[in-house]
């Protein structure tokens, strides 16, 4: 049961690549053969791990080969290998290299921003719930967090967030699409909000799930960085590129801000992670394959939830947020009993559950578990 309508047109966003027909989509899927059961056996875990919004098909074969071909340089520190990746990302985003901050996953980017701007009493405005690594880390260094509840439709309350900005506000945090709700802010609303807020403070836009957006021509807020606005954007290689275990991400910010963030990095990213990220950016076929498989898996989740009459949010990500109509702790235990691991609770929405997309085998495992629970 869909909570609100969603467009499923133009499901594939690509830079320089579009899949023009269904036959081409099938060709892409057929030409890339990767293990279907990898996630079920990882670390000896027998569960279908649908809890962390990972890409079960990654990394691509080209990335795997690049990693193996560069094993000989693992004995060297990675300083001399950064420049090529920085340039590749800068070209991808359409900015100069001094706008880019390499981070160990987008999580490090979130944390160093929280440290840099939330230090000793800085105020941060954020939606609630959201992916809160930045806020949690900033609190450890004395930041004051103002949480603005999402609306009844689980959207960012941009009006409420704007009203909370004052002279002590050091950062406004936006997650778009939002984790865990999967909702997407209308492009014009987001641009207007960011422009207005950036006149008063720094705006951070977490775009970890940006690649999954299907709305035609939906803009990245990197465009505002290019205009010189006080905006920081985070991106990750952990989702569509399938590199979660290598911890690769980056920030895009104006050079003056980027320099301050670089000074607060805990360490530098590893050589093989940089090699993998550089190759992943150029592998458009795997990018398309991953988006196609995510679309198929998400539709399978929708069908399962619809058949059971469960309310869910149409998602612009690689997960679906739904109401199981049961106490979440007990529900998660029931799922695990039948071989499926779902996401953690997301207070204050403790009557909602987040399930990640997976392989079709895992989606069938999820459906079977749900039928056992609700049958």
Task: Locate each region found by the language model.
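PLP-dependent enzyme catalytic core of the Aspartate aminotransferase-like
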Residues: 334-337, 346-375
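N-terminal "arm"/small-domain region of PLP-dependent enzymes with the aminotransferase-like
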Residues: 19-76
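N-terminal export signals
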Residues: 1-30
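Phosphate-binding glycine-rich loop
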Residues: 84-123, 137
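PLP-dependent aminotransferase class I/II
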Residues: 230-313
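Active-site pre-lysine segment of PLP-dependent enzymes
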Residues: 158-167, 180-203, 207-238
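PLP-dependent aminotransferase-like
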Residues: 116-174
């Amino acid at each position: 049961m869909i909570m609100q309508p969603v467009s499923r047109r133009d499901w594939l966003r690509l830079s320089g690549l579009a899949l023009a027909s269904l036959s081409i989509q099938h060709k892409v899927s057929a030409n890339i053969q990767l293990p279907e059961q990898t996630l079920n056996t990882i670390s000896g875990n027998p569960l279908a791990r649908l809890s962390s919004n990972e890409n079960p098909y990654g990394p691509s074969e080209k990335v795997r080969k690049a990693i193996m071909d560069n094993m000989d340089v693992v004995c060297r520190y990675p300083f001399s290998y950064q420049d090529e990746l920085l340039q590749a990302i800068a070209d991808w985003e359409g900015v100069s290299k001094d706008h880019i901050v390499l981070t160990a996953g987008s999580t490090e980017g979130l944390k160093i921003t929280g440290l840099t701007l939330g230090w000793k009493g800085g105020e941060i405005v954020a939606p609630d719930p959201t992916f809160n690594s930045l806020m949690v880390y900033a609190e450890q260094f004395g930041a004051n967090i103002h949480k603005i509840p999402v609306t009844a439709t689980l959207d960012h309350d941009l009006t409420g967030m704007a009203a909370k900005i004052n002279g002590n506000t050091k950062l406004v945090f936006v997650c778009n699409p939002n984790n865990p709700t999967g909702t997407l802010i209308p492009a014009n609303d987001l641009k207007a909000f960011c422009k207005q807020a950036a006149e008063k403070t720094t705006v951070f836009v977490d775009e970890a799930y940006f690649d999954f957006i299907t709305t035609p021509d939906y803009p990245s807020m990197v465009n505002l960085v290019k205009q010189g606005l006080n905006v920081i954007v985070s991106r990750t290689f952990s989702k569509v590129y399938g590199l979660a275990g290598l911890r690769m991400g980056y920030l895009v910010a104006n050079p003056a801000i980027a320099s301050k963030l670089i000074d607060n990095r805990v360490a530098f990213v590893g050589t093989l992670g940089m090699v993998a990220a550089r190759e992943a950016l150029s592998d458009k076929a795997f990018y398309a394959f991953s988006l196609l498989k995510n679309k198929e898996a998400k539709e399978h989740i929708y069908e399962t939830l619809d058949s059971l009459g469960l309310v869910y949010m149409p998602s612009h990500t690689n997960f679906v947020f739904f109401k199981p109509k049961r106490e979440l702790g007990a529900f998660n235990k029931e799922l695990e009993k039948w071989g499926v691991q779902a996401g953690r609770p997301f207070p204050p929405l403790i009557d909602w559950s987040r399930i990640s997309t997976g392989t079709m085998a895992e989606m069938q495992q999820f459906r079977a578990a749900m039928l056992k629970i609700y049958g």
